[in-house]
């Protein structure tokens, strides 16, 4: 029986402060009920061991007794239910966060971030599996991540999810109604999920963390209403309101158009955190002045994408100028630079904005985006082109814009396979999974001598070089004399 694992889980909850000693009997009985057990014999000792090991034992036992199906989705739904029993109620969490915020906003977010890991909402043991490294490029050190923390669904689970009834609740993965939700085959459980109310621009928003943590304290700030993404004056106001309340965090918004936006356009949200991306470190390569806003520092950032950086001690002035630039960009056409505000009534121009505090001043980075497509580039002219799709085909959203590549899990095994062939020989084109990398690998072999000792590191740096090219493709005005001249034409038109 799993009595020891139950006792170990209670011990874990006590050590992490999820429950107190007076909660022990109540929590034990709730766990027994969920596990389908009518009684238990508490062991005399508590073993301090990793949460992953405790939960695995409980899941294996429940599956063996027929309490749950033994597939990844069912196991994730069930262990979240177990952890939800031990997770304090929202009122308790909010009260503790606000108490700490009164002392220091950073103390509050530090506590909440650790809490979200202790509840297993952020599965530390899965995040640790991600492959992460930095790659030196002409634009600074870019961050590369092969995301392995999202569980791979097995074919049976995928089929079951497809056959399951489509519910309209919660409306999406970002809705506040996910807090405490039991989940289903096609929607993750969130009994251990907690969100913190924040007011920005007189609206009710909520702070939470991403369960996949692409970077340190990767947070999501979500609208309390299920409303679509929209970039406008209010967006700039909200971003600056947020960094005013949490000055140790940056925050940004994905663009509001397909191709150049993120994966979720249906729910208005921002992403932020406590991390310094390569784009933030990038210097201003040319200062510019916007007429009527001489009090605002402005310049073009040395970055592969087209970035205007604004800085001022008065956040209201930043909002005014950012709106001015956005309005101008939405209506801007420059045929010589292949920039079209719209074609056939479809708008193409928008902005990816990022806000932060720097040396006591407010700072806004405005990244100019355009989602036009052509026969030659059906996925987008300012999107990674076909020759880069073997590494990155997905949308270039906020996180990538700032210099962090979130790459698909398939690359873990594929890069290992490419390394083997580069070191020991072989024909990549004869392997269905690796054939897509063949042209790239042949080009690399002409420049490097690969050995068992250096292959992994060389490939990592070359993946970084590909990502730098991805960002160059996504840049509207290129880092060439002609591109910078076109960039200045837009700035002078504002």
Map each language-model feature to its residues.
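Active-site microenvironments that recognize anionic phosphate/pyrophosphate groups
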Residues: 1-221, 225-228, 304, 319-322, ...
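Catalytic or ion-translocation cores adjacent to nucleophile or general acid/base/metal-coordination motifs
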Residues: 234, 243-266, 272-333
